[in-house]
Amino acid sequence: VVKNKIPVYAIHLNCDRPPFGLGLIISYLKQSLAPEEIERLDFSSGYIIDAERLREEIEEKGNGIFLFSTYLWNINSHMAESVLIKNRFEDAMIVFGGPFIPRDEELAKRFIVEHPHIDVMVLGEGEDAVLNVIRSYLSDKKYHDIRDITYIKGSEPVFTGIGCIDDVKKLSSPYLSGEYDSFLSVHKPHMVTLETTRGCPFKCAFCDWGQSTNQKIREFDLERIYNELEWVGKNKIPVIELSDSNLGILKRDIKVAEYICEIKERYGFPKEIAANFAKNSHDNVIEIIKKTKEAGLVSQAILSIQTLHSETLRIIGRKNLNEEHYRKSLELFRGLNLPVTIELMLGLPRSTTQSFMSDLQWACDFNLGVYVHFTILIPNTEISRRDFREKYKIVTAAESNLSDPEYLLEIGLKPINENQVVSLESMSQNEFIKMMKLTALFNTFYGESILKYVMFFLKNEHNILQTQFLYDLQHNDLSEYPQILKLRDRGDPDETTVPFTGHEGVLWDTVYENGWEKFYSEVKQYILANYDIADGEELQTVLDIQQFVMGYYGRTLPATREFKYDFPQYFKDIVGGKKNKGLAEYGKCRIKVTDPLNLCSKSSKPDYYEPHHGHIELASDLNAIRFGFDLNEIKDY
């Protein structure tokens, strides 16, 4: 028996699930190391996801090998903790890997020189590299023959090249090897990450998936995938995130989807899947979505459009994914009666305030949900390269006064990621700030449906675009409209959805205590004061319907009410492309609202997993019933 075993610390701070990359690496180590090598190592610390526990483990076990799995959300925490470790243990073995580690030779060498406490950086896929690094550490500590790493030899950085693992079938599954058993005994993750393939054939400028060494799609065995899905069902994991870059690009992906449905039927879990669907494989994707929708695993289709601006699409490598392409996708999804959400990006090269507002308006025209991502420069992407940044004059928050907390407070913004794009040649910083704030308004009044139907009416009856209405609302003096002002300036442009109850923010009074009557009364006065619109029955009907479909705590449901004009049919006809008749041409209607998620009966904030939209609007003829689930109410969870 070996005394004084070397502790191996598997560290992924700020993580809400079993660390997938580290799990693959540790499982592969245990599978591949010789028994005498395993005997020298102590893996008993398991997976460490918070800094306090890391320090406790170090106090108990002391110096060792520290594996940091580094992402955008934990790079700063990892740097701080690893510096403390190196200061305490000069001979600690600090290994950094993960997507935030640069793979370009020049950048990798610069990174390790700037962070001399790091002993080895693993570039790209880490299973083989970490295995060989630990073997060398246990023997002669010579790393020059190990591919996919950067390290310091003497005083000089050494880059050993980069490739990918051709045969992924040799890799051990952390789920099937029992790697996460102890993790699940302590934590209750709502989600796990699975992969059925690796690689991406596309090369989008903002993404590091399709780099030249990773463009070949490599498949894991179906039997392994099926067994992992069985593990998910047996362990009652609510959500599966499939990390495949293009689910549906392979015909066999339909089989995977069918098996997920079968697992849910058998165990009641998972409740939902999150996936990146293939861009150019309509038939497979439609079949997958159709099957998973029927099983209650998806409630919406998500299209990662980024933008419809043709020049920007050309620059970022997506010129073939134009408006016509997405219109076809919309038709297919609508044929499945499936709500559609699009993902947009603010801060892409050659984009302007006009092009961004045009993207938002396109979503409104087709009644689409919207999720806006702020462009962040991550390593190993084309957009992060120095020549690319110089060409398009890309500036990040760290390079501007938007890194100053006091200035952000002064202009009404919350802290911004230091790597977030805040200006380019085509969009000044002031314009960017305006678009961030417009995004916040859009999320609140359109995304949460608070003014969705009112704005739809104004656009179709009075030619006031939704984006123009919100732009006006952003800049107009609202001192006479305190309820509107409160919601307009509530704050965070990155907060896409609003908790229904239990929210200690400016929506509390409106949602929790039913402030809708005061709010919509102000909305009417605001519209009449700022636009050439008569105070007629059509406008009042739309305002009444808008208020009627909004939820609030304690409301008695279901509820039914008669209205003078059939707004649901009017809305359906226009969104569906039928002739644009005026609302006055539609007769009476009765609208019934229901609360399938019991939102109005909750006295505390529900913990919902349902991305890309809020829950304030209730179910009715206007709003397709989209399922969700409260993680706190799942039996045995």
Residue ranges of model-derived segments:
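Radical SAM enzyme core and accessory elements
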Residues: 1-11, 31, 37-40, 55-64, ...
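Radical SAM [4Fe-4S] cluster-binding motif and immediate context
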Residues: 36, 169, 173-335, 346
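A general structural detector for well-ordered alpha-helical segments in enzyme core domains, enriched
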Residues: 25, 54, 77, 81-85, ...
